Amino acid sequence: AAGINWTFAPMVDISRDARWGRVMEGGGEDPYLGSKISIARVKGFQAKNLSDENTIIATAKHFAAYGFSESGKDYNTVAIGNSTLYNTVLPPFKAAKDAGVRTFMNAFNDLNGIPASTNKLLQRDILKGKWNFNGFVVSDWASINEAIYWGQAKDKNEAAYLAAKAGSDMDM
């Protein structure tokens, strides 16, 4: 892949608020269609053999619920119930995992009061536990520091500790 081995795509966020500035990057508002698009994009990047010169490691982002930010505002809070999380938000991410995506990127938002980058339920319990994801999780640009702004961490050291404990493997 011309010396480029890793891409921070595809974005597989489901969004139902056209005001959100990143809505055009995702797979739409339907989790079934979004899942099919997620699979196609992962397979398009990674193909069947990552040692082939025309392949690149894909990253499913933004884990999770970034597309459900309140009022369509980027970086805003996300307050959703388990039904929406499990039946609408997560299916395209699970589809990406099942298609063999090698990395996940966590999100800037919080999910019900817990920043995505330090969210144990999302990263450790669901992604690495229930789904048995063996790749690694990278933060979005400086998203681990969002734990400070959300009031969960007092400084960058505590934010990094909380993120690693929750399942984040690499800080971008």
Give the location of each predicted region.
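Glycoside hydrolase catalytic-domain context in secreted enzymes
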Residues: 1-172
